[in-house]
C-alpha cells in the first residue's frame, strides 16, 4: 500500500507534507522518501517537469489529452510567495499589483491532469466503439465499464473492442470480472 501511495503521489505531484500525512511519518522522513524515489525513478520527475514546462510555455497555458481535449491552467499566483490565492489573470494582477511577477498556478498537477484526461478519453472511446459494435455498456465508473454478457466468449469480444479503442505503442489491456452483480464479480 505504501509503495502505491508513494508512486501515485509522486506521479500526481504530491508534496512532502501530504506524503508525510498519507504515510503517517514525519516530514523529514517524507523528504528522504521523495529524494530516494526520484534518484531511483528519475524519469518521473523529468516527465513531471516537462509537462509543467509545456503548460508554462503555451500562451493559453494548456495541454491536450490523448484525444485532443484541452486541459487548461488559467489561474495565476505571485511568483515566490507561498499560500497566496490563485486567481484568474486579471484578478491576480488587480490583487497583487502590476509589478508583482505572476506564474501559472497548479502546473505541478499537469501530469496528473494529462493522465486522468487521457484515461477518460480512452474510456469514452471504448464506449463509442462498443456502441458501434452493437454492445450497450450499462454503467461506467472511472475506467471501468459494466456490461451484461451471455458468457465468457461474449465478454472476451467486448474486451477486444475495448483494448483496440485507442491505438498506443504499449498495448492497452483490459481485465474481465464476471458475476451476477458488480459486487459479486470475480476476475477470470
Segments (PLM) and residue ranges:
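Conserved catalytic core of nucleotide polymerization and phosphodiester-bond processing enzymes
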Residues: 1-188
